[in-house]
Protein backbone atom coordinates (compact mmCIF):
# COMPACT_ATOMS: atom_id res chain seq x y z
CA UNK A 1 0.00 0.00 0.00
CA UNK A 2 1.52 3.32 -1.05
CA UNK A 3 1.80 5.96 1.64
CA UNK A 4 0.47 9.39 0.87
CA UNK A 5 2.81 12.20 1.68
CA UNK A 6 1.30 14.88 3.84
CA UNK A 7 1.22 17.85 1.48
CA UNK A 8 -0.35 20.96 2.93
CA UNK A 9 -1.78 23.62 0.72
CA UNK A 10 0.36 26.74 0.93
CA UNK A 11 -1.45 29.99 1.65
CA UNK A 12 -1.16 32.05 -1.51
CA UNK A 13 -0.36 35.72 -0.97
CA UNK A 14 -3.04 37.57 -2.88
CA UNK A 15 -2.66 41.22 -3.83
CA UNK A 16 -6.01 42.84 -3.07
CA UNK A 17 -6.25 46.56 -2.33
CA UNK A 18 -9.97 46.95 -1.48
CA UNK A 19 -12.22 44.72 0.56
CA UNK A 20 -15.07 44.45 3.05
CA UNK A 21 -14.65 44.14 6.83
CA UNK A 22 -17.53 42.21 8.39
CA UNK A 23 -17.82 42.85 12.14
CA UNK A 24 -20.17 40.44 13.94
CA UNK A 25 -20.62 41.75 17.46
CA UNK A 26 -22.75 39.60 19.75
CA UNK A 27 -23.27 39.85 23.50
CA UNK A 28 -20.69 37.07 23.99
CA UNK A 29 -18.00 37.59 21.33
CA UNK A 30 -16.82 39.75 18.44
CA UNK A 31 -15.75 38.22 15.11
CA UNK A 32 -14.00 40.32 12.45
CA UNK A 33 -13.75 38.83 8.94
CA UNK A 34 -12.09 40.72 6.11
CA UNK A 35 -13.10 39.59 2.63
CA UNK A 36 -12.50 40.70 -0.93
CA UNK A 37 -15.37 42.40 -2.80
CA UNK A 38 -16.73 39.00 -3.90
CA UNK A 39 -16.99 37.74 -0.30
CA UNK A 40 -14.00 35.37 -0.24
CA UNK A 41 -12.39 35.48 3.21
CA UNK A 42 -8.86 36.86 3.33
CA UNK A 43 -8.33 37.18 7.09
CA UNK A 44 -10.38 36.74 10.23
CA UNK A 45 -9.97 37.01 13.98
CA UNK A 46 -12.24 36.79 16.98
CA UNK A 47 -11.91 37.67 20.63
CA UNK A 48 -11.99 33.96 21.46
CA UNK A 49 -9.28 33.07 18.94
CA UNK A 50 -6.96 35.61 20.58
CA UNK A 51 -7.17 33.86 23.94
CA UNK A 52 -9.93 35.83 25.65
CA UNK A 53 -12.21 33.52 27.62
CA UNK A 54 -15.60 33.89 29.23
CA UNK A 55 -16.96 37.37 29.86
CA UNK A 56 -13.71 39.03 28.68
CA UNK A 57 -14.59 38.06 25.09
CA UNK A 58 -17.50 40.50 25.07
CA UNK A 59 -15.44 43.58 26.03
CA UNK A 60 -14.60 46.45 23.66
CA UNK A 61 -10.89 45.81 24.27
CA UNK A 62 -11.21 42.23 23.01
CA UNK A 63 -13.03 43.51 19.91
CA UNK A 64 -10.24 46.05 19.36
CA UNK A 65 -7.57 43.35 19.54
CA UNK A 66 -9.53 41.10 17.13
CA UNK A 67 -9.91 43.95 14.62
CA UNK A 68 -6.20 44.79 14.84
CA UNK A 69 -5.22 41.16 14.24
CA UNK A 70 -7.54 40.82 11.23
CA UNK A 71 -6.36 44.15 9.80
CA UNK A 72 -2.70 43.18 10.17
CA UNK A 73 -3.28 39.86 8.42
CA UNK A 74 -5.22 41.50 5.58
CA UNK A 75 -2.59 44.20 5.07
CA UNK A 76 -0.08 41.40 4.39
CA UNK A 77 -2.23 40.67 1.32
CA UNK A 78 -1.98 44.30 0.19
CA UNK A 79 -5.29 45.55 1.60
CA UNK A 80 -5.52 49.34 1.84
CA UNK A 81 -9.19 50.37 1.87
CA UNK A 82 -12.22 48.64 3.37
CA UNK A 83 -15.96 49.05 3.62
CA UNK A 84 -17.25 48.09 7.06
CA UNK A 85 -20.41 46.03 7.62
CA UNK A 86 -21.43 45.91 11.29
CA UNK A 87 -23.88 43.30 12.51
CA UNK A 88 -25.22 42.68 16.00
CA UNK A 89 -25.86 44.52 19.28
CA UNK A 90 -22.56 43.83 21.08
CA UNK A 91 -20.24 46.12 23.00
CA UNK A 92 -17.36 45.87 20.53
CA UNK A 93 -18.92 47.57 17.51
CA UNK A 94 -17.33 51.03 17.72
CA UNK A 95 -14.09 49.73 19.22
CA UNK A 96 -13.57 47.37 16.28
CA UNK A 97 -14.17 50.15 13.72
CA UNK A 98 -11.71 52.48 15.49
CA UNK A 99 -9.13 49.68 15.66
CA UNK A 100 -9.39 49.03 11.91
CA UNK A 101 -8.75 52.72 11.25
CA UNK A 102 -5.87 52.88 13.74
CA UNK A 103 -4.26 49.81 12.14
CA UNK A 104 -3.84 51.75 8.90
CA UNK A 105 -6.83 50.69 6.82
CA UNK A 106 -8.77 53.48 5.12
CA UNK A 107 -12.51 53.13 5.80
CA UNK A 108 -14.66 54.20 2.86
CA UNK A 109 -18.15 53.34 4.18
CA UNK A 110 -19.78 52.03 7.35
CA UNK A 111 -23.04 50.06 7.06
CA UNK A 112 -25.20 48.59 9.81
CA UNK A 113 -26.48 45.27 8.49
CA UNK A 114 -28.06 44.01 11.74
CA UNK A 115 -30.97 41.74 10.79
CA UNK A 116 -34.27 43.12 12.10
CA UNK A 117 -37.20 40.66 12.16
CA UNK A 118 -40.60 41.68 10.82
CA UNK A 119 -42.04 39.92 13.89
CA UNK A 120 -40.41 36.57 13.13
CA UNK A 121 -39.11 34.22 15.82
CA UNK A 122 -40.04 34.61 19.47
CA UNK A 123 -37.12 36.24 21.36
CA UNK A 124 -35.47 34.54 24.35
CA UNK A 125 -37.06 35.13 27.74
CA UNK A 126 -35.88 38.11 29.81
CA UNK A 127 -33.11 37.40 32.32
CA UNK A 128 -33.96 37.71 36.02
CA UNK A 129 -30.74 38.32 37.92
From Swiss-Prot:
The keyword Ribonucleoprotein applies. GO terms for biological process: translation. GO terms for cellular component: ribonucleoprotein complex; ribosome. Keywords: Ribonucleoprotein, Ribosomal protein, RNA-binding, rRNA-binding. Pfam families: Ribosomal_S11. GO terms for molecular function: rRNA binding; structural constituent of ribosome. InterPro entries: Ribosomal_uS11 (IPR001971), Ribosomal_uS11_bac-type (IPR019981), Ribosomal_uS11_CS (IPR018102), Ribosomal_uS11_sf (IPR036967). Part of the 30S ribosomal subunit. Interacts with proteins S7 and S18. Binds to IF-3. Belongs to the universal ribosomal protein uS11 family. PANTHER family: 40S RIBOSOMAL PROTEIN S14/30S RIBOSOMAL PROTEIN S11. Located on the platform of the 30S subunit, it bridges several disparate RNA helices of the 16S rRNA. Forms part of the Shine-Dalgarno cleft in the 70S ribosome. This is Small ribosomal subunit protein uS11. It comes from Geobacillus kaustophilus (strain HTA426). The gene is rpsK.
